[in-house]
Amino acid sequence: MAPILELLPAVDVAGGQAVQLVQGKDGTGGRYGDPLNAALTWQNAGAEWIHLVDLDAAFGRGHNRELLASIVGKLDIKVELSGGIRDDESLNAALATGCHRVNIGTAALENPDWCAKVIAEHGDRVAIGLDVRGTTLAARGWTRDGGDLYETLERLEAAGCARYIVTDVNKDGTLKGPNLDLLRDVCSRTDKPVVASGGISSLDDLRALAALVPEGVEGAIMGTALYEGAFTLEEALATVREVAQ
């Protein structure tokens, strides 16, 4: 049996609430109540991972650090923690929650030396988020440009980055389907695992992503489709298992 595509339901937190944004734009999308309840719902439905995001920290307007730490502590499954991790203090706080790994985005673009140091020190506990519009990276809560995707990828490869989380910003929260060409392109330039994020709208989208596992796609982060009931997590897990058989 081939490797199964890992599914990471997203719990994005702003102002203490679970939310989902459209194209990363503040104030868009739905609100879904208590983030711990959301995370426990996905755990109980069979998730092995949660992608937990502090949107306030990502946008640079405070944080939900204590809340996120308490959520990590109450879950029995692996957590990937993301949002506003851009210096030693925020990184150490994130790692101290006991999360399985952290996702660093903006910092990788604004401070490559720090990023290389963190990759060297923490290895597999650090994934780098590549948030992409076309072939340009989007920085700090996606409100600014952050340079060329492939130049940055080359630099991160040289630094020994263990894993990439690739988001097509234009697809995120839109239910318009993932950017398979972008994922293939990134996979062709690295032998490290790639986690896909953005645009998943249907079980067919998951089948298409699962078909890219041999090329290097390891996982898929799902948000809006799950919260809006496009399919259940149980259906999603069954679908990716079928593809792997």
From Swiss-Prot:
Subcellular location: Cytoplasm
CDD domains found in the cross-reference section: HisA
Pathway: Amino-acid biosynthesis; L-histidine biosynthesis; L-histidine from 5-phospho-alpha-D-ribose 1-diphosphate: step 4/9
EC number: 5.3.1.16
UniProt protein name: 1-(5-phosphoribosyl)-5-[(5-phosphoribosylamino)methylideneamino] imidazole-4-carboxamide isomerase
Protein family according to the UniProt entry: Belongs to the HisA/HisF family.
Record field: catalytic activity: 1-(5-phospho-beta-D-ribosyl)-5-[(5-phospho-beta-D-ribosylamino)methylideneamino]imidazole-4-carboxamide = 5-[(5-phospho-1-deoxy-D-ribulos-1-ylimino)methylamino]-1-(5-phospho-beta-D-ribosyl)imidazole-4-carboxamide
Entry's Gene Ontology BP terms: L-histidine biosynthetic process; L-tryptophan biosynthetic process
PANTHER family named among the record's database cross-references: 1-(5-PHOSPHORIBOSYL)-5-[(5-PHOSPHORIBOSYLAMINO)METHYLIDENEAMINO] IMIDAZOLE-4-CARBOXAMIDE ISOMERASE
GO cellular component, one term: cytoplasm
Broad enzyme group: isomerase
Active site: D12 (proton acceptor), D131 (proton donor)
Keyword field: Amino-acid biosynthesis, Cytoplasm, Histidine biosynthesis, Isomerase
InterPro entries, sorted: Aldolase_TIM (IPR013785), His_biosynth (IPR006062), HisA/PriA_Actinobacteria (IPR010188), Isoase_HisA-like (IPR044524), Isoase_HisA-like_bact (IPR023016), RibuloseP-bd_barrel (IPR011060)
